[in-house]
Amino acid sequence: MKEGALMRVAIIGGGAAGLICACTLGEKGIDVTVFEKNDRVGKKLLSTGNGRCNMTNLGAMPEDYFDSAEFVAPAFQKYPPQSNIAFFEERGLYTRSDSEGRVYPLSNQASSVLDCLRLECERLSVRFSCSCDVKTVEKKGGSYVVNGKDAFDKVVFACGGRASVKDFNSYSLLAPFGHKATKTAPSLVRLVTDDKMTKQLKGIRAAVSMTLCSKGKKAATESGELLFSDFSLSGIVSMELSSFVSHLKLSGKNDFSVEVDFVPEMHFEKLLSILSDLAGRSGLKSENLLSGLMPKKIGICLLKKAGISPEIPMNTLLQNQLRDITALCKKCVFKITDVGPYSQAQVTVGGINRNDFFETTLESKKHKGLYCCGEMLDVDGKCGGYNLQWAFSSGRLCGESIIRESRK
C-alpha cells in the first residue's frame, strides 16, 4: 500500500490552489476528492491573464502582498516562483517570461495550465465531484463530513474569493468552526470616475505614470498602460491602483483621485521647452501640438481642458498657455468615485482571517485537520502573476503539511 493511502482528504474548490494541492497529495498516494461547484474544475483559471494565464512572477516576494508579507513568507520560502515553474515543467508544461517578470505558458493559453493540473490529478487517481455545491462541512468525531454523507480525515478549503464569482457564499462554510471573514472589496479592477473626458476617449490607450491620492496625499504610484472607457480608467496601471483604493477604503480612508502623467519620460521644463519650440515653428492647428507625444485624441482633450481651442494655430499660443498645457500633460487629475464590481474584479481584498491559521502549515489554529489556502484567505497581491503565485505556493504548502501529518 502506498504511503498515506489510508488518509482521506476533501478539497473544497477546484481552482488553482485546490488542484495543485490535490496533485501534491495524490503524488504520495493520499486519497483525495475535489468538490467543485461548477460543472468542471478550473473555470476561473481559464480567464486569467486575458486567457493566457499569468502563472507567476519571477520577482514575486512576500512584500508584494500588502500587509500579508509575514504570513506568506513560509510558503514563498518553500515554494518560490522558480519552484512552481519547475513543478509544471516536470509535467511537460514549459513557460516563458516577459520583461516585467510575468510568466506564461509557452502555448500562451490558460487551457494548457489547466490541462496540466487536471491530467496530473487524473494520473494520480484524484476524484472530482463536479456540479457539487458544498452546503455543509461538519466535524463528527475525528472526521470532517461533507454535505452530511462523505467522511474525511482532513479538509482543505480552497474556495477562492468573491471576485468574478456569482452568488459566492463559501465563507459561511467555515463559520461553524469559528473562522470568520474580514471585510472584503474588489481588487485588480477598473477605477470608476465621473469625469466626462473618459467617455470621449473610450478605447484609447496610453503609456503613463499614475499616482493615487487620498485626500490630496500621495498613496501609491504605478506605471504602465492606461485604457479609457465610459466613466472609468482601466488597463494594468489602473488595476494595480485599484488594490490600494480597496485597501484604503477598508481602513476607513476616502476622497480618492489619480494624477496621470502622460509624458513620464520628460520632466516639466524639458517638455515645456519642446512644446514651445514646436509651437514657435508651426502654423498648424493646435490639435497637432501633442500628437507626437501621445494619442492625438488625448492631446485634443488636454487642450480643451486647458481652455484652448484645438483649431487655433500653434504659433499663436502664449507662453502661459503652453505652461498650462504642459502642466496638464504632467498632471491630469481624475476624481475616483469607486472601483469596479466583484463581477469584473480579478481578486478579492480580504477573506477568511489569516491570523487564525498557522503560516507554516496553513492549518487552523482552532481545529486540527482543517486547512485553508489561496484567495480564500485574506491575502492578495499585485497584478502580474502574484496572486496565482500565492495560490500555487499555498496549495502546495497545504498538501505538504498534510503529508507530514500522514507520516506521524
Residues of each region from the PLM?
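A glycine-rich dinucleotide-binding beta-alpha-beta segment and adjacent secondary-structure elements
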Residues: 130, 300-380
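A conserved short coil-to-beta-strand element within the FAD-binding core of flavoproteins
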Residues: 130-142
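N-terminal Rossmann-like FAD-binding beta1-loop-alpha1 element of flavoenzymes
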Residues: 8-34, 398-403
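Glycine-rich FAD pyrophosphate-binding loop
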Residues: 26-50
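Glycine-rich active-site loop/strand segments that organize a redox cofactor
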Residues: 50-97
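Short hydrophobic core segments
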Residues: 12, 35, 134, 150-163, ...
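An anion/pyrophosphate-binding glycine-rich loop and adjacent beta-alpha core
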Residues: 39-41, 46-47, 55-59, 179-183, ...
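Glycine-rich loop(s) and the adjacent beta-strand/alpha-helix scaffold that form part
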Residues: 154-197
